[in-house]
Amino acid sequence: IEVQGEKQTYSIPVVQIEDAPRFEWRGFMLDASRHFWNKDEVKHVLDLMSLYKLNKFHWHLSDDQGWRIEIEKYPLLTEKGAWRKFNKHDRTCMARAKEEDNTDFLIPEDKIRIVEGDTLYGGYYTHDDIKEIVAYATQRGIDVIPEIDMPGHFLAAISQYPELACDGLIGWGEIFSSPICPGKDATLEFCRNVFKEVFELFPYEYVHMGGDEVEKANWRKCPLCQKRIRTEKLGSVEELQAWFVRDMEKFFLANGKRLIGWDEVVADGLSSDAAITWWRSWAKDALPTATAQKQKVIVCPNEYFYFDYAQDQNSVKKILAYDPCADERLSPEQKEYIWGVQANLWAEWIPTMKRIEYLIVPRMIALSEIAWAEPTAKPDLEEFYRQLVPQFKRMDVMRVNYRVPDLQGFYKVNAFIDETTVELTCPLPGTEIRYTTDGSMPTKESALYNGALEVGKTTDFAFRTFRPDGSPSDVVRTKYVKAPYAEAVTAPAALQPGLKAVWHDFRGNLCADIDAAPVKGEYVVESVSIPEEVKGNIGLVMTGYLEVPADGIYTFALLSDDGSTLTLDGELLGDNDGAHSSVEIIVQKALKAGLHPIEVRYFD
């Protein structure tokens, strides 16, 4: 009901509303380790969840970058483990604050303290804090699910209690941090003692134990881990992790709790009392495997539901189109074990609540739609944005830093021959669009877009939308390129159909560096695609010729996770490079009929 004007009383006709959610679990996960959120900030997240009928708050309370929950038996976890010197994530945030003229990336001063001359960042929740937040959530119909991640992602604890790790093997492995040592009985006792205190603070029957991204190399070297493998008649370090997870589940059940784990634990032999959080979009078998084992599954594949990922024009559309039960391999009985959906917010590059708001609104509202409505009842994108208008008005009143819907009417690179017109639209009424053409950041004093702009030369635009309250959204940059049709080339004598694809064993973060990595295979592909044989560390270089049927301006979409580049006629046309989540850019070029050399690079 949208209230307008200053009238104080309203009449609502007598009606009967019949409505119910499609899924029982409608969740949101907040990472409090990489960056810390105080009590009021957590309550604010709970308020937003409550507005849109999300009812499960998954609280990530420990990780390598900080331990956030008081454990009375082990005081160093918060005395020392809750605080750190600025790390690469903090430095990246501070750099972005300056580069993008965006205070959302500044590190809050109330989470910084000076100890013996060192600047430390952090914070933690006392038992009383936890009880207060749990009560606040309960009043809003929200269950709180704590996560203490183990056996990996445990460096904040291991740094204070090094005896928890394999002897002499503390730090970082090839990808992830050193895990705990499951060969030590004392380590297992430590884990149980931590969870005993956690169980007492959180009344909900489920507790999350993590279980993801475990660096097992230390276990291969550790005599105690190898002894455990022999004693328990295990065959590998993978089975050692499975043994540890099963052992913890027994402890959970003995204490009246049920275990939830990330989808890496789906093959660990857990009981049907356990639940699985499916996060790896590429682990396609996790969902059918878990449901076949009669384990409840919380669906949150990163491609759709990692709200820390950068947003583009497709983000909301993808969420609305997603059906958690669409996997054709699932029987009707298996679909009954799909417990619901959840969005996850990892906070490496999110230091402020304003940045959280920007990343989750309106995506949280789209999540609520698919959690509540049957597929046939969901709105299409146009209708969804129409329904959002009053929601944005509510956000304005609440002073929520929501993301303004994408400006429409242009691509990342736009081609024209003689002259063209820039015509913009914004789906949200009441906004202002300011722009610059000199590379600077648009401000409230920059030129106001109030109608079509005539362009007769190559021009770089920076557009920024300002909400009705005057607060800015992110800057969008686009290039208009004036150029004649690019000439075609003469066909080589030995030209064959398809593209040549060279696969490199690449572990870097820039497409230009792929060539230096070892070659693992060469293929011919019919289109720009990843050959079926290519897995693991991927660096692909695809080369060939594009056959253009007629003179014209052609449009290319480049979608990748991580980086990609498109080079046409020797010119870098599409730059989607760097390590990032799924992002699409669209570019144009004026081409003459005939053959044009093309190169596409991609790494993951």
Where are these regions (language model features)?
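Feature activates predominantly on carbohydrate-active enzymes
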Residues: I1-E189, V194-Y206, D247, F251, ...
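Active-site beta-loop-alpha junctions enriched in small/polar residues
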Residues: S33, S62-G66, D149-H153, D212-V214, ...
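Active-site neighborhood of glycoside hydrolase catalytic domains
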Residues: A157-E163, D167-D273, R280-A292
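Flexible, acidic glycine-rich loops studded with aromatic residues
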Residues: L259-A274, R280-T421
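Short, compositionally stereotyped local motifs that mark structural "simplifiers"
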Residues: P379-V502, G508-G544, I553, L559, ...
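Short beta-strand-plus-loop segments that form exposed binding edges in beta-rich domains
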Residues: E599-D604
